[in-house]
Amino acid sequence: MQDILEAIMAAEESNDPDRELAGLAGLPVPESYRGVVVRAEEARMFDGMATRDKDPRKALHVQEVPTPELAPGEALVAVMASAINYNTVWTSIFEPVSTFKFLQRYGRLSELTRRHDLPYHVVGSDAAGVVLRTGPGVTRWAPGDEVVAHCLSVELEDAAGHDDTMLDPQQRIWGFETNFGGLAELCVVKANQLMPKPRHLSWEEAASPGLVNSTAYRQLVSHHGANMKQGDVVLIWGASGGLGGYATQMALNGGAIPVCVVSSPEKAELCRRMGADLVIDRAAEGFRFWKDEETQDPGEWKRLGERIRELTGGEDPDIVFEHPGRETFGASVYVARRGGTIVTCASTSGFQHQYDNRYLWMHLKRIVGSHFANYHEAWQANRLVALGKVHPTVSRTYPLEQTGQAAYEVHRNAHQGKVGVRCLAPTDGLGVRDGELRARHEDAINRFRGH
């Protein structure tokens, strides 16, 4: 592994980094590598505990694992950096189910997928790094290519997947429903997960947008999601977070009017630094949408709606960008305008949603489910990053050995934006190839740092 790292680091000082990196093709592939894993033998370790009390630090381990053989259409990537997504938190606390059920199901699909069904799960759904090897049939990518990976793994043998790959019955989230994920020194991806690394970003910055940026793009911009247009009022929950931070940027870029909901003055300030003018600090304003565990408070829905109208000059949201789930969903359905759209992915506060259906059917609103993104949507979202139109939201980074702590902070909402993880990269700030473009956007790139 040291030879691989030295070859990649040589590109840092080279006038021709592409030439340096092409030399990776001549290096042997290590027989094993370090990865962040959960273990099947520990899948019941948190039984009987409340979700909040489950500690990712106890379940995530860094261990040496064998390097898998490449199947046709796959690539082996030396991972310089990755990031924490909420699906890594779910994996680490074995909720809503153990991910070993996903690996077992995938392993039954074919002889090639059987290698995913192991007593350990290498996790992680983001990666930035350098291609080391490609399997048979891969023509677009070659050893030495600097890449980022999106997390849709799809077989594409079903006709439905050729309309929209997210509709393929064999689509899975890499590093969550498949093995050999990105929180590791090496990862295995399908070639159609790869995209060019934005040249003005460091490794940890380039790794961070992947899952959440693509998810926000489909959910908000794509015709498969809310199909946002100029002038739309968009209510964004968690607007300074890993997902909401990208939704806020896309709303601003697209001429929409974001109403950013956050939970602290610091998070409100981050939204303003992104350019948002309309911000609700729901903690400071005392919004409590549930009276107790069983009873919602429609009076609080109404108060939120009044606050939104106060900020917008009397307008209700055309779009509600939902992802907290149980805690906020009743309010989301209520505050959307007549004919408006509640577009939802994830459910970080709970999967069982309750809302008053009268405000949906009688006001002709619609709920749209959105899940990650297809390759085209992910590519377009990455293009916005590469052009400097959308910026990473990395607030802090950890070395691979401290991935458990990074996941713990995301679980406890003790973070802003995205939390990065350095895998092979020894320090932050490496991998920048376009200094001129970076200089134009330095402030925006770093606005989440240190928060």
Predicted feature residues:
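Helix-to-beta-strand junctions that scaffold the AdoMet/dcAdoMet cofactor pocket
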Residues: K229, A336-R337
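A short N-terminal beta-strand-loop micro-motif at the entrance of redox/enzyme domains
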Residues: A11-G26, A43-A81, Y120-V122, G137-V138
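Glycine-rich beta-strand-centered segment in the early N-terminal region that forms part
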Residues: P66-A83, P96-D158, P198
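Adenosine-nucleotide cofactor-binding segment
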Residues: I236, L252-E327
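Rossmann-fold NAD(P)-binding glycine/threonine-rich loop
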Residues: S347-H363
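C-terminal hydrophobic helical "lid"/dimerization subdomain
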Residues: Q2-E31, G330-Y334, Y375-H451
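NAD(P)H dinucleotide-binding glycine-rich loop of Rossmann-like/cofactor-binding domains
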Residues: S110-P119, S125, S153-G238
